[in-house]
Amino acid sequence: MIVAGRVYVDPRDRERFVEEHRGTIEAARNAPGCLDMAISPDPVDPARVNIFEHFETAEALEYWRATAPVPEGAVAIEKDQVLKHEISASGPPFD
């Protein structure tokens, strides 16, 4: 399972938004079934934050959602475009 996309915040608050999620990222990377988690500032758009979550199964993602720590911050998301993807196969990007 992959959750990926982007959120937009006030550019003045972007670094704070990313930092507020540090604990969530660390917890996710140690959670059962989490293969990767990233919440990163976009290098081109100063308002954009890229979201990437990769879990072994839908159940692992559901468990994470039920137990994930909530960030303490209050940076408002102005717009979001994040989707969940069910993946049936994976392989090298250039084959």
Where are these regions (language model features)?
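Short, flexible segments with low predicted structural confidence
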Residues: 1, 15-16, 32-34
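Short, surface-exposed ligand-recognition loops at beta-strand->loop->(often short) alpha-helix junctions
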Residues: 8-17
